[in-house]
Amino acid sequence: MNGTRIEFEGITKVFDSGKKNITALDGVTLTVEPGEILGVIGYSGAGKSTLVRMINGLDTPTSGKLLLDGTDIVGMSEKKLRDIRAHIGMIFQQFNLFTSRTAAGNIEYPLKLAGVDKAERKRRVDELLAFVGLSDRGGNYPEELSGGQKQRVGIARALANNPALLLADEATSALDPETTHEVLELLRKVNRELGITIVVITHEMDVIRSIADKVAVMEAGKVVEYGSVYEVFSHPQTNVAKRFVSTSLRNTPDAIESEDLLAHEGRLFTITLSENSGFFTAAAKAKDAGASIGIVHGGITTLQKHSFGKVTVRLNGEKSVIDDFYAYLTTTTDIQEIQR
């Protein structure tokens, strides 16, 4: 199966609230390639959910084009939009399962609507229950399932009609961290084995870090940053992106930790480490010039097969040597001195 290609070209959405107009989307332009996982992140009111509603045709742009596999869906008739939606799966934060239907019954429902015959429905439901790891839960009702199991049913239902595109709107927000990890692993499996394009809407950078290929950071209806997860994590350009990255990495000392670190001699610097940060070159030069250097806080992780992290280092030595260390790294990476 090939995933859907999505192209936003100058998409703007203005809502008329009566007293004043509210711009929910402001000139959004970006492309999601077939089989890619795009993470869209932003705080409440950034325009994330409106963006999703544009993709499945539930909202119409005020201006701009929205192309799915090269076809502009803006202005399409409702009948044609229904045909488009038949190839789009949707996963919700609150699961949206029918309480009166079993897990199997919930998965079967969209197949019934599509007119699939009974034998094929059963085959497909059994196949999907196995795919999401719930073969023994088909006869259970939602109230008998955990939150993670309910979301697995939701994912299976979204896959029932073999979509080429999956939209996940805050799909893990109601789940605990361990269950969130399991659901994200399942979405990765969906993408890897079925080739489906996935758009993940979230306010959690850890979700982006875990699953996405690309990330679009939204603020006030605009995409303020867009690129690979590694690019945005290692070199965030806007304040909103920097805030999101800091919530995920948590490698910058807080005020209390900084106070403890400053109780010792030496100057402290918090440095972003990436493959081209130049840190090890600068550290070697400082050591050759007689300075001592040690990592006192932080750590390194892996993002999309790249090493990345933040560390706080303490330097002792001549002022000119430490000044040179700082000046060099200001040209290659993000470095901040912790002031006494």
Swiss-Prot record:
Regions crossing the membrane: none
SMART domains: AAA
UniProt feature coiled coil, ranges: none
Group of enzyme by EC: translocase
GO-annotated molecular function: ABC-type D-methionine transporter activity; ATP binding; ATP hydrolysis activity
Catalysed reactions, semicolon-separated: L-methionine(out) + ATP + H2O = L-methionine(in) + ADP + phosphate + H(+); D-methionine(out) + ATP + H2O = D-methionine(in) + ADP + phosphate + H(+)
Pfam families: ABC_tran, NIL
CDD domains cross-referenced by the UniProt entry: ABC_MetN_methionine_transporter
Role of this protein: Part of the ABC transporter complex MetNIQ involved in methionine import. Responsible for energy coupling to the transport system.
Similarity-based family: Belongs to the ABC transporter superfamily. Methionine importer (TC 3.A.1.24) family.
Stated name of the protein: Methionine import ATP-binding protein MetN
Organism of derivation: Corynebacterium diphtheriae (strain ATCC 700971 / NCTC 13129 / Biotype gravis)
